[in-house]
């Protein structure tokens, strides 16, 4: 009786172990390159090197990171500035080297389903323009980033180009220089200037510009005539003597 029970249990254990082995084999095949899941053959790596001209890699790589499509994949730099980002499926990715002390231009890497790599510049303005880059990537720093805008220094040009200053200076220059440039003794010219000033002076509460111009020109002409008459009078008196 004991022998029969022992034989029954041994046969049952053999059957259970066979079922477990048969259930594990298809799962392992599914995870391989030919299975339905994503295996190691469908994953690739992005390689490259980051360089800062004139600076040793040990001075800046500790705070730098390599980002692929934002923070979807993150890589770290080695002591010589090289980096490898593993476990990346096929597709198009933007690779960036982020450092608080130095700025690097991003690079787009296209990975085909067969593992062929193609690197190019990232151009957000002209997306159709393709400028090829060598692979593995050679990312060179363009200098320190500018976190602050430099304050503009004060200059005389800023003062002179101020609208308030121009509104005060230009009319003064016109009133001072215009009588010297224009022939004020010509009555026709004077009449045209008075008419143009009256057209500009539409507000009746303001002083009449034409009256001001007339007084200005008449005072000059009367001064000239009086000086001329005084000279002629003196010359006539001298002749009489």
Swiss-Prot record:
Component of the ER membrane protein complex (EMC). It comes from Mus musculus (Mouse). GO terms for molecular function: carbohydrate binding; membrane insertase activity. The lineage of its organism: Eukaryota, Metazoa, Chordata, Craniata, Vertebrata. The chain crosses the membrane at residues 159-179. One of its GO terms (cellular component) is membrane. Residues 180-241 are cytoplasmic. The keyword Membrane applies. Residues 23-158 are lumenal. It holds the Pfam family EMC7_beta-sandw. Residues 218-234 have a biased composition (Low complexity). This is Endoplasmic reticulum membrane protein complex subunit 7.
